[in-house]
Regions:
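Conserved sequence/active-site signature of Rossmann-fold short-chain dehydrogenase/reductase
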Residues: 65, 128, 182-184
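N-terminal Rossmann NAD(P)H-binding glycine-rich loop of SDR-like oxidoreductase domains
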Residues: 2-24
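NAD(P)-dependent short-chain dehydrogenase/reductase
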Residues: 168-197
Length: 197
């Protein structure tokens, strides 16, 4: 079974569709206040049989900042796709965002380790990477110090990646992807979609 956090977001909703379409059994985390209409719209975009596929998703209420709910949700899970994160460039959201993103990722990593999850895929951000020189190739070994001039969001993603790498040192099989601006069908008008307002 595959566990997905951030399932109600842009990347997460499309990921859910592709995982379900591939025959995977899914457990998706959502907040009790989440509106699933956006996820349904993404499924509707991809297929006429959207409702059948959507109804195959097992949903669980929880929050990445609640370790106990994650520990329970990851029991019997083989793979985790962790995409839940708060995105904000409002300085007033700094502490909430740092807590949600860093502590939330630490909780996901710890629950995965505790329950013997086979693999974790963490959806980070290009914001977490050091600046690169023109035409420089970035590999898995490219990891430097966090440049302080970046945003609080970048800091939260960088420090979240540190939690994932800590997990790998403790035996977790994990990968990190660092998307930049993510565009595609059904894009909401927040996050990358805000560029189109």
């Amino acid at each position: 079974m595959v566990f997905v956090t951030g399932a109600t977001g842009f990347i997460g909703a499309h990921l859910l569709y592709y995982l379900i379409s591939g025959g995977n059994e899914i457990l998706a985390l959502k907040r009790s206040s989440s509106n699933l209409q956006y996820v349904k719209n993404v499924f509707r975009y991809h297929t006429r049989d959207w409702e059948t596929l959507f109804n195959r998703i097992n949903w669980t209420d929880g929050d990445v900042t609640d370790y106990d709910s994650l520990l329970e949700a990851t029991q019997g899970i083989d793979e985790v796709f962790h995409g839940a994160a708060m995105v904000s460039f409002d300085p007033g959201d700094m502490y909430k965002m740092l807590n949600t993103n860093i502590r939330g990722t630490a909780n996901v990593v710890n629950a995965a380790l505790e329950n013997g999850v086979r693999k974790l895929a963490y959806i980070s951000s290009v914001a977490a990477l050091d600046p690169v020189k023109e035409n420089q190739i970035i590999t898995e070994k490219f990891f430097g110090n966090f440049p302080q001039r970046y945003s609080n969001y970048a800091e939260s993603k960088f420090k979240s990646e540190l939690e994932v790498w800590r997990g790998t040192e403790e035996g977790l099989n994990a990968v990190v992807v660092n998307p930049s601006i993510v565009l595609g069908p059904c894009i909401p008008m927040e996050g990358s979609g805000s560029f189109f307002k």
